Amino acid sequence: MIAEDIKEQAGAGRRTSAWYVNALETALSNLQVEDSDTIDTGGITLGSLFFFDYKVKHPEKYPFWDIQPLAVALRFDGDGFLGCNLHYINPDYRDAVAESLLNSGGGSVVPKNSIHKYLFSGMGSLYKVPDDEDWASISLLPTERFVDKRGRAYPKNRAFNWRK
């Protein structure tokens, strides 16, 4: 499984978030399959988990955002899709939410602050996480990368807020 392989590669040493992002992208890139049915939806299929680069269109509107979302596509919405970004969920609960989303095909109740609209135009590299992978373990890899309006790192613990 991907997450276990990445943890093994990391070993006991401290690794940066960028290292984990690179390791996950490398592992997922080997598993990507072209699907001509998703050409008009930017490669997105509802109920699937995706890891991608994201550039916000109007950064002035948001106090912070995740530039490396790990999101389950819930609904198409015009020029993008609504997704549950697991990175906004406290890691203590994230794996349970990921497992619930996998088992329900994206039909689970999730924290409100984890729902975000992603524009197709803001998406960079896109990797689908296969359904037979352990979404819960992948969700716990430290790949979240929050930035503020000025492009500076935003504290992860402030982004993990169930109350919003």
Residue ranges and their predicted role:
Residues 50-51, 70-72, 136, 160-161:
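Generic ordered-secondary-structure signal
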Residues 61-101:
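Basic/aromatic-rich interaction segments and small domains that mediate binding to polyanionic partners
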Residues 2-50, 58:
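Mixed-charge, Lys/Arg-rich low-complexity intrinsically disordered regions
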Residues 9-11, 45, 76-81, 103-105, ...:
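Intrinsically disordered, low-complexity segments enriched in small/polar residues
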Residues 15, 45, 49, 80-85, ...:
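Compositionally biased, intrinsically disordered low-complexity regions
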Residues 88-164:
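Intrinsically disordered, low-complexity, charged/polar segments
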